[in-house]
Amino acid sequence: MNTRFYNAKILVLDAENHFSITEDELHVTGDTITYIGPGRKADPDAAETPVFDREIDARGNLLIPGFKNAHTHTPMTFLRSYADDLPLHEWLERQVFPNETKLAGDDVYWLNILGIMEYLTSGITSNFDMYIQQKNSIAATVDTGFRTVLTSGLNNFVDSPEILEEMYNYVNELSDRTSYLLGFHAEYTTGGPLLEAVAKLAEKYHSPVWTHNAETKSEVEDCKERWGLTPTQLMERLGMFQYGGGGYHCIWMEDRDFEIFRDRKLTAVTNPSSNLKLASGICPLKHFYDNGINLAIGTDGPASNNCLDMFREMFLTTGLSKVREMDAAGIPADAILYMATAGGAHAMQIDDCDRLAVGKKADLVMIDLHQPNMQPENNLIKNLVYSGSKQNVKLTMVNGQILYENGEFRIGFDPEEIYARSNAIIRRISGSHADN
């Protein structure tokens, strides 16, 4: 599909990673951005005007790169508002792990589609997903037209190094919208032999490694009792970070941990809503930022958030950082927006869709500026971070295809069917229990 956006404000990111806004046209040919500039011709020397399947008057709207949800567990939609108000480890052991064992057949497929629908309404065009039954998850991505990077939730109870390697090869060859990076659930759920196996696979495939890292204070204390090292230091000793990667949450960090992240060029993914809801702590974002460490933002799963909304995550990311450091000027709004877009793309190794530029994949969002919360237009970047909302998302395009527009989904599924299937799954698993 070839699409022309005209009369558009366009958020662009230059080679020095500075945002600016132009008023131009943007052309999409197939899955790629082929022109950004004035006029109508993609090539000013061309004899003929390009042929477009769709021409969209974007007056009063802002085109931005799609948000990258850099940490999530998408199919956990079935546990949204089911088990809440518990600390992390009690929540996992009493509610999450037992109910996950009851997922059967194609449950994960349908639950993943529900999550993808929510992503699209929030302008999220790709996710970095860790969950079980990954062939069902990735099938949902392929069938809806979404973009997903998977990593493994390998632990003492689920999967094996052999399954991890099988999925790594399968997903990386499946589609240009799917990829796989090595990982495991967490140090506290994964024994030494499995950790060593992951390190060997990282060396074999020259792959980054990802995991939950320093999410709670007790996690770090227990790891130090077992190994005499923090989770970050343990993974460094095992050789997991030879080819990059990083950690999700990264709250309870020590000075040496920051040094490892800096020296290995790792990424820290912050998940503010989940960390607040589970009372895990506040990520020391400013320490990462001041050390030049790449940062990204994730929603975490819909059972611990419970919302998949990048606008909310951006506001909480900046707000919590300011309060933690007692510094209202600590991290500027454009840096937060970078984390939610290009920073996430870098973490996920999908740099071909990190920004709106010629030659990049057409993963973009059209933001409605003619809403009270986006006026006046003093600073549109700050509006996105401080006052933006998913109500402003008018259109979401992934890989050149419009998957969501004006409240309607174009993913090949009836939303009512997805809602019905999702409710049926949790009713079956819970025995019709509902926490009212």
Residue ranges, per PLM feature:
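His/Asp/Glu-enriched, well-ordered alpha-helical/loop segment
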Residues: 237-244, 286-369, 387-390
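Divalent metal-coordination and catalytic microenvironments
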Residues: 8, 26, 31, 60, ...
